[in-house]
Amino acid sequence: MSRYRGPRFKKIRRLGALPGLTNKSPRAIRDLRNQSRSEYRIRLEEKQKLRFHYGLTEKQLINYVRIARKAKGSTGKVLLQLLEMRLDNILFRLGMASTIPAARQLVNHRHVLVNGRLVDRPSYRCKPRDIIMPKNTTKSGVLVQNSLQLFTGKELATHLNLFSTPYKGLVNKIVDTNWIGLKINELLVVEYYSRQT
């Protein structure tokens, strides 16, 4: 199954606000109380929220769940930490891109340096003390500057620092899962995959 490239607003109406997918918000969420929702459907919707927000394929999400299961600690929290520390998500949280798909495009088009080295993989896992900045070209600088102008006034994540002289971001620590701006029950996602295998 490939990455979703269809109408984004349909997904937002179905699953609720997904800030990583688009910066629009749904007008009115349909009343789903009359419909009977099975446990499977609830788990599936939570999994789909996570998948569409971060722009992952099904296979990528399965791999992240496997890695999270092997790690110490709560599988759900480790899963969210792994997803939040992806390079495309860090660029989105820093405000260098308006959405996660826009951040993926920045990375794929080779506009981003991590610790002074060119990185062209959106799934690159950032670590604490990583420095993320646009490439030293005018085109890269303009793209990031335009996104940062739209970002002004929004709250920056506690695990990140943004410096404006040369535009660069610093990852201070691993993200705290309480800060994530997505209403999701990560345990239902883990349950969904534990029942699949």
Swiss-Prot record:
InterPro entries the record matches: Ribosomal_uS4, Ribosomal_uS4_bac-type, Ribosomal_uS4_CS, Ribosomal_uS4_N, S4_RNA-bd, S4_RNA-bd_sf
SMART domains from the UniProt entry: Ribosomal_S4 (SM01390), S4 (SM00363)
GO MF terms held by the record: rRNA binding; structural constituent of ribosome
Family: Belongs to the universal ribosomal protein uS4 family.
Domain annotation S4 RNA-binding: ranges: 85-157
Gene3D superfamilies from the UniProt entry: Ribosomal Protein S4 Delta 41, Chain A, domain 1, RNA-binding S4 domain
Protein name per its UniProtKB record: Small ribosomal subunit protein uS4c
GO cellular component: plastid; small ribosomal subunit
Keywords per UniProt: Plastid, Ribonucleoprotein, Ribosomal protein, RNA-binding, rRNA-binding
Domain of life of the organism encoding this protein: Eukaryota
Quaternary assembly: Part of the 30S ribosomal subunit. Contacts protein S5. The interaction surface between S4 and S5 is involved in control of translational fidelity.
GO aspect biological process, one term: translation
Pfam families: Ribosomal_S4, S4
SUPFAM superfamilies, alphabetized: Alpha-L RNA-binding motif
Lineage: Eukaryota, Viridiplantae, Streptophyta, Embryophyta, Tracheophyta
Function: One of the primary rRNA binding proteins, it binds directly to 16S rRNA where it nucleates assembly of the body of the 30S subunit.
Cellular localization per UniProt: Plastid
Transmembrane regions: none
PROSITE patterns xrefs: RIBOSOMAL_S4, S4
NCBIfam families associated with the record: PRK05327.1, rpsD_bact
Predominant place of localization: plastid
